């Protein structure tokens, strides 16, 4: 959970524009006319520059999912109530429900601002990116995180089970900025152990679990430590690398703190020369190569570094015990769940009402406007607290709940 109180006036306008587009999709009454200068959707606090298409954007097929499509480039006039082209193919009520479930323990503004920053404060490009993400997620991501490891075992998803039991990627504490750390051990990877889809599901489960570790007033992002000890060419698999790049560029923007590549062997050099050409400059800027424990200490404290790497973390990475369901007692309490969900729905409606007033209010920075801002912060906090209450009633407990490292 985090709040951004450092927005400039122009940046705040872009945030309001994105909320206005979402409101029109969700059929929430709001008049955003005065926040679209010259009645154009092309507002940006920085000059828009043409850039090369990322690997992700080259794969897009439908109009509403293309970041470089007409939805992101065409200058059409704003009309009160008119749904932006990038959102036109989305179901209003399904998308609304999904959005408020997906934010979990992050504030609504923090979630949207990640997309805005990724598109350099260009409202059109942001809404195109956000529209694609909403389409991509649908109900899939919530099913993965809420079902957790238990659902994987119950459905006998052998490839995902293999990755879990190898502990190929695990969450191991925090970095020096209190970002959760995902430890990845590529030496354990062999493409024949799972299908591409199973590896993608495992990756999404770990990424979504890491988001539950976010701490209030600290960066809502994750650090990934790739330990290349023992890595050989038999472990190399480009498909999952491309998938991870896609995820962080397109669906988890501004969510990567650092990507630490530790003890890369010489055979990794030609591989790196290929991979680096796929990277968005923002993602590339987060990559750091480390060679020893002292260099790791610049990013992660010893208590969170596994002992085999020279740290003090004694977590057992050789033996995996799957959750047995004994902590899932609240999942059957549908009455309490319904009560907490009703409270959440009421908080969402209050937030939408106050946000519509905040969008429409003029002049800025008068006492009434400041009160609206403060009310939005209060409701955002209440939504985060509500999710903490709701979580045990909708999400099967993970191995991190069992070992006590995760406290939502």
From Swiss-Prot:
GO terms for biological process: Golgi to plasma membrane protein transport; Golgi to plasma membrane transport; negative regulation of fatty acid biosynthetic process; negative regulation of phosphatidylglycerol biosynthetic process; phosphatidylinositol metabolic process; phospholipid catabolic process; phospholipid transport; positive regulation of phosphatidylcholine biosynthetic process. It is found in: Cytoplasm; Microsome; Endosome. The modification Phosphoserine is found at residue 2. Coiled coil: none annotated. The keyword Endoplasmic reticulum applies. It holds the Pfam family CRAL_TRIO. This is Phosphatidylinositol transfer protein CSR1. The lineage of its organism: Eukaryota, Fungi, Dikarya, Ascomycota, Saccharomycotina.
